[in-house]
Regions:
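Walker B catalytic acidic pair
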Residues: 193
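Active-site-proximal or metal-binding-adjacent scaffold patches in catalytic folds
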Residues: 1-188, 197-232
Length: 232
């Protein structure tokens, strides 16, 4: 079920979309256009959703101000580092690259935001394809003593989660948007998914395993929230 409505939060009025899903917690995303997307368990009421939004006022206001425009002269984040963004005309084919000086998007039409967004997303995917297998190889020895098999890895652009897994297929899936966050955030997500090979639910035993593998996991899980506004 989908509900669309508006809500005054502080001095601003926000449009929000609310969907009930088979999940256990309320989730919030601030879209690039400033609207809000909320997903909730089936039993949650509209009153509870709006109270949840009011409680997240500071996050919403901060995220709304930081929305990513991908305009020339603005900035993007790569592995947690803020880097200047340059929009340049493409001479042959449009493409994107990361240099020491910043991130470059070579475009056919400078005012075409869709082209910039697609190039940016492709850049994150290509970077993830290069870096994340190395992250898994580095972290696997931490999980191996617990009997976790070496998994296959898939990469996807996802809206509602940073990672997922299918232990029966020995598979983990990582969100390509993790490229924008510090590598320690990706470490936390990878180890989180590997712990699900040992415990399918978020039980006490699950978090005990995760705490052994990465004692500071809470810090990096919390840090990931800062990068949600940059997920286009």
């Amino acid at each position: 079920m989908k509900t669309t409505d508006t809500l005054r939060i502080g001095e601003n009025v926000y449009e929000y979309e609310w969907r009930r899903k088979p999940i256990k917690t309320l989730n919030l995303r601030v879209r690039p256009d400033g609207s809000l997307y909320v997903s909730s368990p089936p039993f949650v009421s509209k009153k509870e959703v709006e109270r949840f939004l009011q409680e997240r006022r500071l996050f919403i206001e901060k995220a709304s101000m930081r929305g990513l425009t991908l305009a020339d002269g603005t900035s993007v984040h790569i592995f947690g580092k803020e880097m200047p963004l340059f929009i340049e005309p493409a001479t042959r084919r449009h493409h994107a690259c990361i240099t020491e000086n910043g991130v470059y998007l070579y475009v056919y039409e400078k005012d075409n935001r869709d082209e910039r967004v697609n190039l940016y997303r492709n850049l994150l995917k290509e970077t993830a394809e290069h870096v994340f297998p190395q992250v898994l190889a580095r972290l696997y020895p931490v999980a191996a003593p617990y009997g976790v098999p070496y998994p296959q890895m898939k990469l996807r652009r996802m809206r509602s989660r940073w990672g997922s897994c299918m232990p029966t297929k020995s598979l983990i899936t990582l969100n390509t948007y993790l490229v924008i966050a510090p590598l320690s955030c990706t470490d936390q997500v990878v180890l989180h998914e590997l712990c699900h090979f040992l415990e399918p639910n978020h039980s006490v035993r699950f978090y005990a395993y995760l705490s052994r593998m990465m004692p500071e996991w809470r810090r990096w899980r919390e840090a990931l929230k800062e990068y949600t506004p940059y997920c286009l």
